């Protein structure tokens, strides 16, 4: 959902990902942060030309089901969240304002009962951004891939910043998720991290799932993305009434 342009091209006779218009956060991540984050697989940086990154191509996509079954999904996210590394560059600042909420709700046109529920959660949402752990900020299934050797890799780092681990777990919950699905994700994650209790993670996961609706709605409509209407219709069908 970012503003960069991505394509495959040859570099020294081998296919790579050329990402032009990469954000400063993502450029700095690959140049300065990635090497310090042990236990986390990210694409190798092959070359940099200004705001254009040439990255290792990760050839095999993964499904959400595959991510759930792969212990490395949760182990790698936990490694990131527990990292002692402190970036020496400006990272993405995440937040959830009432203005952003009202903007998204005006677009979504949900029943007033749903609007009130979302506004109530927004008032508590500051908890998501009080955490001092590093997060991807965009760990949806489309940003994972598998190398030929079977290694799981997480890419697309323009939202690299600080926040609750639940922000990275929320995209792993199918659709809007049931309580059992939330608890299953938390159980897998807690095998690798004790940063937050299960109860705290569940609370944050509900908040993060709601926050992502606001974030995605506003990003897609502000950037006039062609898939915006598809997402909006899906949200209207899925959100409680």
Tell me what each language-model feature is.
Residues 26-29, 37-39, 117-129:
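Short Pro/Gly-enriched beta-strand edge/turn motifs at strand-loop
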Residues 61-96, 111-119, 125-127:
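Conserved kinase catalytic-core helix
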Residues 25-26, 235-241:
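Regulatory N- and C-terminal appendages and interdomain linkers associated
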Residues 50-66, 101-103, 210-226:
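A glycine-centered beta->alpha junction motif in the catalytic cores
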Residues 71, 153, 170-173:
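Glycine-rich, phosphate-binding/catalytic loops in enzymes
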């Amino acid at each position: 959902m970012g503003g960069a342009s991505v394509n495959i091209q040859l570099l020294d006779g081998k296919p790579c990902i050329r990402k032009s218009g990469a954000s400063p956060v993502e450029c700095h991540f690959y140049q300065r942060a990635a090497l310090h984050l042990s236990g986390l697989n990210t694409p190798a940086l092959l070359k940099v030309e200004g705001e254009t990154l040439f990255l290792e191509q990760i050839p095999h996509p993964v499904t959400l089901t595959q991510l759930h079954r792969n212990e490395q999904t949760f182990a790698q996210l936990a490694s990131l969240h527990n990292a002692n590394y402190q970036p020496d560059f400006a990272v993405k600042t995440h937040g959830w304002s009432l203005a952003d909420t009202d903007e998204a709700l005006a677009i979504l046109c949900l029943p007033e009962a749903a609007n009130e529920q979302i506004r109530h959660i927004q008032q508590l949402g500051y908890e998501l951004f009080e955490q001092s752990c590093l997060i991807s900020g965009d760990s949806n299934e489309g940003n994972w891939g598998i190398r030929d050797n079977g290694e799981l890799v997480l890419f697309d780092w323009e939202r690299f910043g600080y926040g609750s681990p639940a922000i990275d777990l929320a995209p792993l919950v199918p659709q809007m998720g049931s309580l059992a699905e939330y608890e299953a994700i938390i159980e897998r994650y807690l095998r690798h991290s004790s940063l937050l209790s299960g109860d705290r993670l569940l609370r944050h996961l509900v908040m993060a799932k709601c926050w992502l609706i606001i974030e995605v709605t506003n990003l897609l409509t502000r950037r006039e993305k062609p898939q915006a209407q598809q997402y909006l219709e899906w949200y209207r069908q899925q959100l409680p009434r």
